Amino acid sequence: MIKEKNNLSLTKSILLILISISIAVGGQILLKIGMNRMGNIAVNSMSSLGHLFLGVVKSPMVLVGLFMYVISAAIWLVVISAVDLSFAYPFIGLTYVLILIVSKFILKEDVNPIRWAGAAIITIGVVVISRG
């Protein structure tokens, strides 16, 4: 499960995985907030692509969200250099759970019981896979 070349302990590996996931979730939330401020964008022509690009460049929320993705990816590269991908990757499922929680409590989105049940199943799945 853990490769010796980078000498990461299991605890440190899991911590880095969770940090990477949390930063990615934070980035996704900032992207959503930034895009909500921009409004709906219909990409049906080159001019609308230009409008999207200009909107992104002018939006601090979107730019910071994208930067957070870069940081998350850098941490992820450290993780997968040290642990098996089959161990690390299932933790990505926790992004769905965290997005659900943050969407409910920060973005004030409606989350129905079926989604909560799905989040519970995902969490159980990640725990089972990580112990295997």
Write out the residue ranges for each language-model feature.
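Polytopic alpha-helical membrane proteins, predominantly small-molecule transporters/carriers
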Residues: 2-132
